[in-house]
Amino acid sequence: MKKWTIDDSKELYNINGWGTSYFGINEQGNVYVTPCKDNTQIDIRDVMDELALRDVQSPVLLRFPDILDNRIEKTWSCFKKAAEEYEYKAENYVVFPIKVNQMRPVVEEIISHGRKFNLGIEAGSKPELHAVIAVQCQSDSIIICNGYKDQSYIELALLAQKMGKRIFIVVEKLNELEIIAHEAKKLGVKPNIGIRIKLASSGSGKWEESGGDASKFGLTSAELLEALDMLDKKDMRDCLRLIHFHIGSQITKIRRIQTALREASQFYVQLHKMGYNVDFVDCGGGLGVDYDGTRSPSSESSVNYSIQEYVNDCIYTFVDAANRNDIPHPNLITESGRSLAAHHSVLVIDVLETASLPEMPEEFEPDENSHQLVKDLYEIWDNLSPRNVLEDWHDAEQIREEVLDLFAHGIVDLKTRAEIEAMYWSVCHEIHALSKNLKHVPEELMNIDKLLADKYFCNFSLFQSLPDSWAIDQIFPIMPIQRLNERPTRNATIQDITCDSDGKIANFATNRHNSHSLPVHTLKKNENYYLGVFLVGAYQEILGDMHNLFGDTTAVHISVKDGQYHIDQIFDGETVEEVLEYVQYNPKKLVRQLEIWVAKSVKQGKITLEEGKEFLSNYRSGLYGYTYLE
């Protein structure tokens, strides 16, 4: 067997596919990140070792703001290139919807670096608008107001506009137009109104229903005409500045985007023909991320196009429509939050322990006292061959089921059941190995790897840190961050530490295809074994919940300066005290209640005074500790 190399690991985990030049494997066999154009490599294992010296324990979320900056620059440069190629004569604006990641340090970094790149912010709710207006105080960047709106939302937006903010209020429902008109007249403001149009076109992938006739938001063609009539009657025709459409997030197929763009461009043309001088088109979101690195339109975790191709289609479609109809090119807005934010965050978790299925030692042989079914299964195991692999599988299944039934009725003993189970799983392992060499693998054997996988128990909550993995079976790139110059000899599923059977990951992107298990190494004594979960910067932090009261993980900001990495900030993960307060417990009251109980127990002689003090000390220190295992 040839020696394992880091090139083998690169291929196995397809890091060159999903890493998009940000992630790789160094000569030490560790995963590195390259956040900047200067190609400075940050060894993630080195980072974890330094954090351990600072008493920072996993799980930890590593944020690389330089990657955010690079994604902004990359998207802007794609627009610049397309504008030159298609002689685009208007402005383009990249807008970050903060619902993608509302964490203050992330939003502030995007705003700060995005100022020179026409980067704006989108708010989809009243709380988001409150955040956006405040952090954008010193900027004249565009603010897009989406989502459902009431009178106070609209008043806040209009007053901000009156003070100089470039705000567009997008009408999602007809009744919002009435409120906008009323508040604008009251405040003496000429509003910048946008209208979200419900296209017939829809996206592809997990969020396909976000667009098309079944979409939640937007005005139909008939409602659009009604809105235009309302604007005319209120003498607000010139307030209509923008049209907006959105066909879904993470669109996997470029053809769906092209179809939607063509449809939307005709709305722009028709409005101009009707005398409405709309000068902005918001193309919404949808620019996807290649999570599995396959560039496959058939994978819901991938996309079959690049940022440049997406941008080219956006600009070309509207330039072509405008030129054909002799109308101005529109200013184009894209809300590509997932593409901007996904790559900048890496979740690092440590493996606590492992569990494997029992296997029969190779030297085992049944004796004269063994049950006949043990002898029968041993005969199958001893004579396995590729020719009869499916028949052997069926026979082994039948024997196991028969023994389980006999055990349930008290007919066979525990020793017989244990021998059958261990031998059955040994048979399964060998059948799986044999089936890999078959030209046509029987359908029943295709998922046998799912049955055989080890369980690697990791110190994290799936529901808190990777909610999309649980909720919609989103695939994220996952791999060990060390020992990648060694051959991984085990295959495992990942189990979290919640008391929930759903707290597991059993779908992985490996070797350019999806697998039910992840290739991993056996654990070494007294050595931490870390797994990295990549591309988690979009939606995961903010969607995470406190199942089993596991709180936010520690977040660490790492930047590159003068060719070296620097740990800029450490945001401590939530403590037990903090999560208890979320669910309306008063930690001080809890301590007082325990003090009374302990005093009573000491008085009754159930524990000593020293034991009582030790108990209260442990309880108090636990309240102020990390919600995860330390």
Feature-to-residue mapping (PLM):
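A non-catalytic, amphipathic alpha-helix used as a structural packing/dimerization or gating element
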Residues: 66-74, 226, 263, 313
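Short glycine/threonine-rich loop-to-helix capping motif typified by GTGT followed
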Residues: 251-259, 290-307, 339-354
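Charged (often Lys/Glu-rich) extended helix/loop segments that serve as interaction or gating elements
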Residues: 313, 319-630
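Active-site-proximal beta-alpha core segment in soluble small-molecule metabolic enzymes
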Residues: 87-282, 287-289, 304-309, 317, ...
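Short alpha-helical segments and helix-capping/turn motifs at coil-helix boundaries
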Residues: 7-9, 73-81, 104-109, 129-130, ...
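Flexible, glycine/charged-enriched surface loops at secondary-structure junctions
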Residues: 58, 62, 84-89, 274-278, ...
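Low-complexity, highly charged intrinsically disordered N-terminal segments
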Residues: 20, 25-102
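Charged, compositionally biased N-terminal leader segments and the immediate start
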Residues: 1-31
